[in-house]
């Protein structure tokens, strides 16, 4: 093992390697309101005590290194070091522990998710003394969160911009995700928006490929938006993906979207990076654009139970970096997502104050103070039969996004959109009348089918479609 010792006033420098726990394991420490707190799930190597492993995590993610260095004496490690202040075994797991680490605020640059993550989830994740390490949760104190702008606009401002209240918003990802020409792509957008959707979406893969350059796509999509608005009398939008190979190109695409007068653009925040995302978020607030966020690559980071970063941490990071929507899983669709865990980080995205609740995976009470909220987006393998459950689970402040569940309608895109809109409004009305959607949701849809042939056709097509697999990431 390897670490660093604290050099106290009057003590001489003693070279060598000493246990991390001598300096970084401090069970007597009382956390401060200004500390950033982290909960790590750690699996030590055989023979490594959990106290030493927890101290190593605190050291290597803050001021420590593998040996004592004489420059320790030029600063105050006691002021700047991370501290492992508690360790608890994980119930039902062999040799797994939750290590709680407190970091002083001065370790991190203000307003920089990039710097925060570089320290807390940096080199320590490759540390040999650990078989595996996962960051389960972070407590971001108001003293730090107030250094971030957060979402460009937030939930209430978005509703005011698009003039839609009292129900979830409806979206659709255009399929096939790759291969359409810009003109045919715009046609699909128009049909979906005219049929009753609020938004359509670029797939996360769509940037500027040879079959459809970004500028052509933006032009045809803008035409589709304005035509559908004129015909329906509703404000419509399409998530134009501004993600690009450089920040300069990304901002150029965002500027062109603003010139066209569209209401919303999109970014892949993990593949694009937090620095790029924060820059784009600032641009969107300054220029009145809503910002939809896709989480492509998240499962590489968050799906394994014992190593990586839980999505609740990535969700908090996005709220600080900036985005008005983010994909959050569906609970009922084709993508990973256990109900209570999903609802836990959905609350972390939307609410101002979230109490500690280990039953939902929330390790710390989180106070966002006045930071705007983010709309969770349920997307992936959902169709009209899921509408009652989605309405009940996610509530009004959400975006329900049906790709194949719109474009796969046997009568075409516009009827597919109409089916989803009718299903949603029927579920919202039934809920508002006091009906239990968990028990009577299917009956609500069958009743609505009597006056919507589009919905009846959709219900017939997808009546047997289910995605019943065991969730990997459980509490």
From Swiss-Prot:
Its cofactor is Mg(2+). It is an enzyme of class 4 (lyase). The record marks 334 as: Transition state stabilizer. The active site is at residues 175, 294. PROSITE patterns: RUBISCO_LARGE. Binds 1 Mg(2+) ion per subunit. The keyword Transmembrane does not apply. Changing residue 258 to K: In strain: 1c11. The modification N6,N6,N6-trimethyllysine is found at residue 14. Residues 1-2 form a propeptide. GO terms for biological process: photorespiration; reductive pentose-phosphate cycle. One of its GO terms (molecular function) is ribulose-bisphosphate carboxylase activity. The disulfide bond which can form in the large chain dimeric partners within the hexadecamer appears to be associated with oxidative stress and protein turnover. One of its GO terms (cellular component) is chloroplast. It catalyses: 2 (2R)-3-phosphoglycerate + 2 H(+) = D-ribulose 1,5-bisphosphate + CO2 + H2O; D-ribulose 1,5-bisphosphate + O2 = 2-phosphoglycolate + (2R)-3-phosphoglycerate + 2 H(+). Its EC number is 4.1.1.39. It is found in: Plastid, Chloroplast. Pfam families: RuBisCO_large, RuBisCO_large_N. The keyword Magnesium applies. Mg(2+) binds at residues 201, 203-204. The modification N-acetylproline is found at residue 3. InterPro entries: RuBisCO, RuBisCo_large_chain_AS, RuBisCO_lsu_C, RuBisCO_lsu_C_sf, RuBisCO_lsu_fd_N, RuBisCO_lsu_N_sf, RuBisCO_lsuI. Substrate binds at residues 123, 173, 177, 295, 327, 379. The modification N6-carboxylysine is found at residue 201. The basic functional RuBisCO is composed of a large chain homodimer in a 'head-to-tail' conformation. In form I RuBisCO this homodimer is arranged in a barrel-like tetramer with the small subunits forming a tetrameric 'cap' on each end of the 'barrel'. This is Ribulose bisphosphate carboxylase large chain. The gene is rbcL.
